[in-house]
Amino acid sequence: MKLKRILTTLTTAALITSAVALSPSATAQEEGETKLGLNALTNVLNVAEYQFDSNLADFDILTYLALDVMGAKPNSAVWALADGNVKMTAFLPTDRAFKKLVKALTGTSYVRERKIYLAVRALGFDTVEKVLLYHVVLGAPILSEAAVAANGADLTTAEGSTIRVAFDGTTLRLRDKDTKRINPNVILTRVDINEGNNQVAHTINGVLLPKLG
């Protein structure tokens, strides 16, 4: 599937989701129940206008990798990021997080985002898909306050294995299955992205790794 086709598909899906959100049946809610919005995380990632740049604090590499998997695997669960009806919490690694991962894996510290992206992409679509799904927890969105209160809890990811929440009073850390590298931290100044919708996200400073190979 070509990139243009993927973007067209995502744009169409966003329009349909918006229409559903505005329909009378969608706005009807149970008494006392808060109705969450349907804005998908692909809109937050801005898939229509993303590009490599010098800003390592954003999500360009993550966006490219997600679109790669969507293109290579039309039935991948990664597509759920584009479906605002699917409730989830996603932990989003920054471009700098991928830079640290590539350096740890290859010993090379790339400056340009494109080279970092290509190094991760070289792991193969199956591995990239597995890693991306390991950053997604399906179910009711978990806001940062609840995450902090969930110290010691194991969260089951869309990949199938778990990540453990660890909060020491100042740092919110996510413990993955990789025992060789430092566990990622949640960047507490960049949490609750897309709050009020079925899909929320929190920024992390490292890439979560499931068991690979």
Model region roles, listed by residue range:
Residues 1-11:
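Bacterial N-terminal signal peptides that target proteins for export
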Residues 13-14, 153:
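Repetitive helical segments and hydrophobic/amphipathic motifs
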Residues 17-25:
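C-terminal segment of classical bacterial N-terminal signal peptides
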Residues 5, 25-213:
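Mature, structured domains of secreted/extracytosolic soluble proteins
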